A protein has these predicted regions:
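Sec-exported extracytoplasmic/periplasmic mature domains
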Residues: 335-346, 494, 498, 534, ...
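Conserved catalytic/binding loops enriched for acidic/polar residues
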Residues: 474-479, 504-902
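Auxiliary tRNA-acceptor-end handling modules of aminoacyl-tRNA synthetases
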Residues: 31-322, 340, 344, 349, ...
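Sec/Tat signal peptide C-region and signal peptidase I cleavage site
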Residues: 27-29
C-alpha cells in the first residue's frame, strides 16, 4: 500500500548521487577519539542557498526557498529567517524514523531539567506518508506483529492502527521530486506535552522559535525554544517571570536501524529491562508475548577468538561540565564493567573518553553517549537508555548526575513527614510502582540519590563524633569518591540494560563486609545494582571500607546472559544456551529481586533498599547501637566552632538528629519485614540448587524481630534524649527564594517519633501482612512451629500496652508519670488500628477481625483493673489517658454489637 503512494520517478540522478555520497560519509563520532568525524551542515555555516527551477512547481520551490540556507543530511533542511523546511524525497516516505526527545536547557524544577530525556520506555517511531497534497506524520504501532505474509499479519493490520499526529500541506516540490513541508506545525507545538508538568501554563506559539539546527548523513538535530505562558500567578523560583517560561527541547531524528542485530530473549531469572511485543503468528498455549532484553549491539572483531575487542565498542563521553576532581572516580566506575564483559568474551567493550572544552557536537546528539553533570538543584542521578522498540537494541544512553547529589546535608532532614518516611522505606499502600527506568508509566529516575545522600550524611555524622579529632578532609574525600564510583557503576548498569537487584547486599554477613581483604578482592554485595548503604560500624567494632565499589558475581552473570556471543543467528536458536546460563539462578550469589519485589506489602525480607548483610536483625541492632553512640555528641561536633573560631549552626544539629532518627527507623522497618515474611526465589523447577519459589521465615526469626521492635521501636528508651538536645534542634533561619519554611521552628518531637513508630506498626498490621501470617500457618508442616495471628496480636499488645498490666504500685507525678507521653501517643495509635481491624475496615480477614475485637475486650478488662487499684496512684495525665482509651474502645465494642469473638 505504501508503494502506491510513492511517485514512480522518485529520485533524479543528482539525488541518487547525493544519497550515495551521504551514506558513504562516516557516522559522527562513531569510533574515533576525535569528537566528530562527520561534519554537520549548520544554519550558521557556509552552505549555499537553494537554487530555483524553471518549471511551475520548481519555480514555487525557488521562490519559497530563495535565500534559504540549505543543510544537506539524512533529511535535507532549508532554513530561512524564522522558517524551517524539510525536503522529503519519495525514498524517505514510508521509512521508519526513530525520534528521541530531550531537554537541552530546562528550568531546574518539576522534572524539566537540562539533559533529561522525555518519554521513558515510550520511544517514538515515525513515518512520513504522502496523502494527496499533504504529508502525514504517523506514529507507528510497534507492539503487535505477525510473520510477514502470513494470514495473521493481515489480522494484525486490521486490528491495530497507527496514530496520525500531523498533516502538513506540501509547500513546494524540488527539481528532484522532493516534497517540501514547513516543520513549524509539527515541532513548534507542545509535541512532548510538557504543559502537563506546568499546570496553568500553555504553549505560546508566538513566543517560540527554532534554536540550533544541525544535519548529518545519519541524523538531524532540531532545537526548539519552546515558551509556555501563564497569567504569572504561579511562582517558580528558578524562573524570573512565569508569564513566559522557555524550555529548549531537542529532537534527534534518525532512521530506525536495519542491521545485523539479533534480539535476545529475556528470562525472569535475570534482571534486564525488556521490550515486550505480541507475536500473533506464534502457536502458543499461554500468552503471545515475545520479550527481548534491552542491550547494546556488540560483535567480536575476531569471532574465533575467546576474547576479542568488539567491532564497535560502547563509548561514553565524560561531559566537559563534570568537575575535574570527580572525573577519575567516574571513569573508574564506568570502566569497571569491562571486567564482566571480558568474562563474556569482549576486551575493552566499554571505552571512556573526555569531551574537549571546545567541540562542535552536543550531548543530546543520538550518536553520543554521555556522562552529564547538571545543576538543577534537585540532587539526583539517573542512567536512562533509548531502545529500538521492535528489537530491544539500545541506541542511545546518557547518565545524568545533578551536582546536588553530593550535597548530603539537606533541609528536608529537619522535619520528616509520613510521605518522606514512606519514600525512605519502599513506599506505601496505593503508591505507584517504584520501577526505575522500567517503561511507560515507570519512575523515570533511579531513586538511589535520596537514600545515598542520607547515608553519606550518616557517615559524616558518625565519623565526626566517633573518630578522635572528627572527620578529616581526607576521610571525607574518601567517603565521597568511594560513593561516587559506586553510584556511577550503578547508573552505568542501567544504561547496559540491567534492572535493580535488591538482594545484592543480603548474602554476606556484616563481618564479611568489614573484612577488607575479602571485599577488596571479591567485593561486598553480589550486585552493584542494589541500593547499598554506607558501611559504618559502631565504635569498637571492626570497620571495613565505606563502600565496596566492585562488581559482584550477579553482575558478571547478568552480563554473560545478555552479551555473550551465542551461535544461532536467531532469538529462538539461542534459547538452549541461554537456558544453561539462566539455569544457574539457584546459586545463592545469583539471587535476584527487583522493584516490584521490594514495595509495601511485598513478602521477601531480604529484598530491601539500603540494607546490609544477611541478617536484618543484626543490621538493625548495629544501626541502633551506632545511633545511641553518636546522638549524645552531635551538638558538640555538628555545632562546634570551626578552626577559624566561627560558631557552628544549630540547623546542622537538627539535620544530624533527623538523619540518625531515620537511620534507626529504616533499619527497624526492614527488620519488621521478617514478620509474615516469605523468602522468594525466581529459580525455575529443575535449576540446580534451586529453592522453592517461597520459603516461610521461621517462627523463631519472626519472634526475634518482634522482640527487637518491642524494645527499639515501641519502647521509650531509644527515644529518651536529653532535654538539652531537644532545645538545640533549631531550624534553618533563612527565608528567601529556594528555601522552604518548616512547620515549626522547634522540633516536633512527638510527631516525628510517632511517624516512625506508625510506619512499623502499619506494616505489622497491614491487611496483606495479616493475611500472610494466617496463610503461613498452612505453609508450615504441622509438626513444625509457626507464628500464629493470635500470637502476633498478643505480642503487639504486650509491647505497646505493657503499662496496663505492668504498672507498679506507687504514686506517680506529672514529672514522673506512669505512662510517658511518647507511649501515650503510641497506645492511642495502636488502639485506633485495632478498632479499625475489629470493625472489618477492609481487611477481609475474619480471623484478624475476631482477634482484634478480643484484644480490645482484654484491654477494657485490664484498664478497669488498673484504674481500680488503690495502690497505684496515677497522675492526672495517665489517668485521663487510660479513661479516654477505655471510652474509645467501648464505643467500638458498642457500635459493633455483633463483633466476632476469637
Amino acid at each position: 500500500m505504501l508503494a502506491s503512494l510513492c511517485r514512480p520517478r522518485a529520485c533524479s540522478a543528482a539525488l541518487i548521487v547525493f544519497l550515495v555520497a551521504a551514506c558513504a560519509g562516516p557516522l559522527a563520532g562513531a569510533d574515533d577519539a576525535s569528537p566528530a568525524k562527520a561534519e554537520p551542515a549548520s544554519a550558521a555555516g557556509d552552505a549555499k542557498p537553494a537554487a530555483a527551477s524553471a518549471s511551475a512547481p520548481q519555480a514555487a520551490y525557488g521562490v519559497l526557498l530563495k535565500d534559504a540556507t540549505k543543510l544537506p543530511g539524512l533529511i535535507p533542511l532549508h532554513r530561512k529567517d524564522d522558517k524551517l523546511y524539510a525536503e522529503l524525497s519519495d525514498s524517505l516516505l514510508g521509512k521508519e524514523f526513530f525520534v528521541l526527545t530531550s531537554i537541552a536547557r530546562g528550568i531546574g524544577e518539576r522534572s524539566l531539567l537540562g539533559g533529561m530525556s522525555i518519554g521513558f520506555g515510550d520511544d517514538w517511531v515515525w513515518q512520513f506518508r504522502k496523502v494527496d497534497d499533504t504529508i502525514q506524520v504517523v506514529r507507528r504501532s510497534v507492539r503487535f506483529f505477525a510473520a510477514q505474509g502470513s494470514p495473521e499479519s493481515k489480522a494484525v493490520d486490521l486490528a491495530y492502527t497507527d496514530s496520525v499526529l500531523f498533516s502538513v500541506k506540501i509547500a513546494a516540490t524540488s527539481p528532484s521530486g522532493g516534497h517540501v513541508i514547513d516543520l513549524a506545525p509539527i515541532f513548534l507545538t507542545d509535541l512532548p506535552r510538557l504543559a502537563a508538568s506546568l499546570p496553568g501554563f500553555s504553549f505560546a506559539r508566538d513566543r517560540s522559535n527554532w534554536g540550533r539546527i544541525k544535519a548529518f548523513p545519519d541524523n538531524v538535530e532540531l532545537e526548539v525554544a519552546a515558551t509556555y505562558g501563564s497569567s504569572g500567578a504561579t511562582t517558580i523560583d528558578t524562573v524570573p517571570d512565569t508569564r513566559g517560561v522557555t524550555i529548549i527541547i531537542r529532537y534527534s531524528i534518525s532512521l530506525l536501524p536495519q542491521n545485523s542485530y539479533v534480539p535476545r530473549l529475556a528470562d525472569d531469572r535475570v534482571g534486564y529491562f525488556v521490550t515486550a511485543l505480541k507475536d500473533f503468528s506464534q502457536q502458543v498455549e499461554e500468552d503471545r508475548f515475545v520479550r527481548y532484553i534491552n542491550r547494546w549491539q556488540l560483535e567480536k572483531a575476531d569471532p574465533k577468538a575467546a576474547i576479542s575487542p568488539p567491532k564497535k565498542p560502547i563509548v561514553f563521553w565524560i561531559e566537559k561540565t563534570v568537575p575535574f576532581r570527580y572525573r577519575p572516580a567516574i571513569r573508574k566506575g564506568i570502566e569497571s564493567w569491562n571486567e564482566a564483559f571480558e568474562k563474556a568474551g569482549f576486551a575493552n567493550a566499554i571505552e571512556v573518553r573526555q569531551q574537549p572544552d571546545v567541540t562542535d557536537w552536543d550531548p543530546e546528539d543520538v550518536n553520543y553517549n554521555t556522562f552529564r553533570w547538571i545543576t538543577s538543584g534537585q540532587g539526583f542521578a539517573m542512567g536512562p537508555s533509548r531502545v529500538n522498540p521492535r528489537t530491544g537494541q539500545i541506541l542511545d544512553a546518557d547518565i545524568i548526575f545533578d551536582a546536588d547529589f553530593l550535597q548530603f546535608w539537606r533541609r528536608e532532614y529537619e522535619t520528616f513527614t509520613p510521605q518522606s518516611i514512606a519514600a525512605l522505606t519502599g513506599g506505601g499502600p496505593g503508591d505507584p510502582p517504584l520501577v526505575g527506568h522500567g517503561g511507560p508509566g515507570c519512575c523515570p529516575a533511579c531513586s538511589l540519590f535520596a537514600g545515598h545522600a542520607r547515608e553519606t550524611a550518616l557517615a559524616a555524622t558518625a565519623l565526626a563524633v566517633n573518630v578522635p579529632g572528627g572527620l578529616s578532609e581526607e576521610e571525607k574525600e574518601k567517603l565521597v569518591t568511594q560513593g561516587l564510583t559506586l553510584v556511577a557503576m550503578h547508573e552505568l548498569g542501567h544504561t547496559l540494560g540491567l534492572r535493580h537487584n535488591f538482594k545484592g547486599s543480603a548474602l554476606k554477613s556484616l563481618a564479611d563486609y568489614n573484612d577488607v581483604e575479602k571485599t577488596r578482592t571479591s567485593g561486598g554485595s553480589t550486585s552493584v545494582m542494589d541500593y547499598i548503604p554506607v558501611n559504618i560500624m559502631p565504635k569498637g567494632k571492626t570497620q571495613g571500607d565505606y563502600y565496596s565499589a566492585r562488581l559482584g558475581p550477579y553482575d558478571i552473570w547478568a552480563i554473560e546472559y545478555g552479551y555473550k556471543p551465542l551461535a544461532g543467528g536467531k532469538p529462538e536458536a539461542e534459547r538452549k544456551e541461554l537456558e544453561k546460563i539462566a539455569g544457574r539462578s539457584g546459586e545463592p550469589e545469583l539471587a535476584y529481586a527487583t522493584d516490584e519485589d521490594t514495595q509495601w506489602g511485598d513478602p521477601d525480607p531480604h529484598s530491601n533498599r539500603f540494607d546490609l548483610g544477611s541478617d536484618p536483625i543484626e543490621f538493625a541492632r548495629a544501626r541502633a547501637e551506632l545511633v545511641a553512640q553518636v546522638m549524645p555528641g552531635i551538638v558538640e561536633r555538628m555545632a562546634g566552632r570551626d578552626e577559624d573560631g566561627d560558631g557552628g549552626r544549630y540547623e546542622r544539629v537538627r539535620q544530624a538528629f533527623g538523619v540518625l532518627l531515620s537511620t534507626h527507623g529504616s533499619a527497624m522497618y526492614n527488620a519488621s519485614r521478617l514478620v509474615g515474611g516469605l523468602v522468594g526465589s525466581r529459580s525455575h523447577r529443575g535449576d540446580a540448587n534451586a529453592p522453592p519459589p517461597f520459603t516461610v521465615v521461621t517462627a523463631a526469626r519472626q519472634r526475634e524481630a518482634l522482640d527487637l521492635l518491642a524494645v527499639e521501636m515501641f519502647g521509650s528508651k531509644p527515644f529518651s534524649f536529653s532535654p538539652e538536645l531537644y532545645n538545640q534542634l533549631a531550624s534553618s533561619r533563612w527565608m528567601h527564594w529556594g528555601t522552604d519554611e518548616v512547620d515549626r521552628e522547634d522540633y516536633p518531637v512527638h510527631d516525628v517519633i510517632l511517624m516512625w513508630q506508625n510506619r512499623v506498626l502499619s506494616r505489622l498490621l497491614d491487611p496483606l501482612v495479616l493475611a500472610r501470617v494466617r496463610d503461613n500457618e498452612l505453609k508450615v508442616p504441622a509438626d513444625q512451629d509457626s507464628l500464629s495471628l493470635a500470637e502476633l496480636f498478643e505480642r503487639l499488645s504486650k509491647a505497646v500496652m505493657a503499662e496496663v498490666e505492668g504498672t507498679a504500685a506507687g504514686e506517680y507525678t506529672p514529672r514522673k508519670p506512669a505512662i510517658d507521653s511518647l507511649r501515650r501517643s503510641l497506645q492511642r495509635s495502636y488502639v485506633t488500628r485495632l478498632s479499625a481491624i475489629a470493625m472489618a475496615g477492609g481487611t477481609g480477614n475474619s480471623d484478624a477481625q475476631a482477634l482484634a475485637a478480643g484484644e480490645l475486650r482484654k484491654l477494657v478488662a485490664g484498664l478497669d483493673t488498673l484504674l481500680a487499684k488503690e495502690d497505684v496512684k496515677l497522675e492526672p495525665m495517665s489517668r485521663a489517658h487510660l479513661v479516654e482509651l477505655r471510652a474509645r474502645i467501648m464505643k467500638v465494642l458498642d457500635a459493633g454489637i455483633d463483633l466476632p469473638r476469637p
